C-alpha cells in the first residue's frame, strides 16, 4: 500500500485542525489588515464510510464555512483534509476535478441552487456530461432513472425549476448530487428552507438513498432535532470550534457542553417537564 492509499478501516473523510480566517481590512488609500474573523478555528472530525455525521450549530457558528473548506470551494487558512487517505487541502481546481465525482454537495436553498434557465434534464445531467460519464440517449436514461429514484417523474426531464415546489426542487438537487455516484455527500442545511412536513419526507429520502447506495453524509443543520434523527454521530459547533462530539444518543441524552444544552432546549417538546430536564442536562 502506498502513502496515498487508505486502509479499508480508515475514515472516508478526516479533517484535522481545520482553520479558515477572513481578514478585516480598513484604510483610506491602502487597505491594511486590522483583525480577522475566525470563522473556523481548529476543527477536527472524521466521517466513516456509510455513516452520517451531523454538524450542528446556530447561524454564524462556522459549520457551512467548514464544509466549503472541506470541499476546497474556499481555500483553508491551515489544517489537513484527507479524503480516502489523500491530502486534498490546497489542491487546485484541476487537481480537485476527479475528486468531484466522489464528493458532492446538496445546497440549502432549493430556489437559488438551480439554474432557472436550464431544464431539469440539463441540471441533473450536467455533472455526467462534464465528467464524460454519459451523453446522448444514455445520459437521458440515467437522468430519468435518478428523477424517479428521488420521488419525481421521468416526465419532469424537460421542465424548468419554476414549475416545481420547494420540496420537489430539493429532490432535483439531490438527484444532481447523486448523478456521479459519490461516496460522500455534504448536505448543507438541506431542509431548513422547507415546511416541517416536507422536511420529514426529504430526511426519509436521504435515509433510503444512503441505505441503497452506501453513501456517507456530512449533514449540516441548526436544528439538533433533525440532526439527531438522521445522524449516527453529532459534532456541535459554536463560534468556529467544535465544543462537543459523540454518538447521536450520547450528545442528545447526556449533553456536556452548555451550548449543546441550549440547542436541545430549543427543540419543541410536547411535555414541558422533559424540556426542563434537558435544560438541566438530565
Over which residues does each language-model region extend?
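ABC ATPase NBD coupling module
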Residues: 29-34, 88-104, 130, 137, ...
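A short, proline-enriched helix->beta-strand linker immediately N-terminal to the Walker B motif
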Residues: 179-183
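Short catalytic/signature loops enriched in Gly
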Residues: 2-11, 24-32, 36, 247-282
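Conserved ABC ATPase signature
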Residues: 160-164, 168
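Conserved ABC ATPase "signature" region
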Residues: 87, 138-155, 264-265
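Conserved ABC transporter NBD signature motif
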Residues: 79-87
Amino acid at each position: 500500500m502506498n502513502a496515498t492509499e487508505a486502509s479499508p478501516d480508515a475514515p472516508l473523510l478526516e479533517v484535522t485542525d481545520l482553520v479558515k480566517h477572513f481578514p478585516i481590512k480598513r484604510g483610506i488609500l491602502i487597505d491594511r489588515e486590522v483583525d480577522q474573523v475566525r470563522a473556523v478555528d481548529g476543527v477536527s472530525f472524521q466521517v466513516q464510510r456509510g455513516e452520517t455525521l451531523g454538524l450542528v450549530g446556530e447561524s454564524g457558528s462556522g459549520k457551512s464555512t467548514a464544509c466549503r473548506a472541506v470541499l476546497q470551494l474556499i481555500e483553508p487558512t491551515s489544517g489537513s483534509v484527507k479524503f480516502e487517505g489523500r491530502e486534498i487541502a490546497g489542491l487546485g481546481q484541476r487537481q480537485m476535478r476527479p475528486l468531484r465525482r466522489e464528493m458532492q454537495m446538496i445546497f440549502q436553498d432549493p430556489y437559488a441552487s438551480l439554474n432557472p434557465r436550464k431544464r431539469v434534464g440539463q441540471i441533473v445531467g450536467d455533472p455526467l456530461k462534464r465528467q464524460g460519464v454519459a451523453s446522448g440517449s444514455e445520459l437521458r436514461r440515467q437522468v430519468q432513472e435518478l428523477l424517479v429514484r428521488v420521488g419525481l417523474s421521468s416526465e419532469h426531464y424537460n421542465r424548468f425549476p419554476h414549475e416545481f415546489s420547494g420540496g420537489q426542487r430539493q429532490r432535483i438537487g439531490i438527484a444532481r448530487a447523486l448523478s456521479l455516484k459519490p461516496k460522500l455527500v455534504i448536505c448543507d442545511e438541506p431542509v431548513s428552507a422547507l415546511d416541517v412536513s416536507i422536511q420529514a419526507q426529504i430526511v426519509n429520502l436521504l435515509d433510503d438513498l444512503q441505505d441503497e447506495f452506501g453513501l456517507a453524509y456530512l449533514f449540516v443543520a441548526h436544528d439538533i432535532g433533525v440532526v439527531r434523527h438522521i445522524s449516527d454521530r453529532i459534532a456541535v459547533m459554536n463560534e468556529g470550534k467544535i465544543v462537543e462530539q459523540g454518538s447521536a444518543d450520547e450528545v442528545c441524552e447526556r449533553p456536556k457542553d452548555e451550548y449543546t444544552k441550549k440547542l436541545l432546549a430549543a427543540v419543541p417538546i410536547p411535555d414541558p417537564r422533559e424540556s426542563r430536564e434537558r435544560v438541566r442536562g438530565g
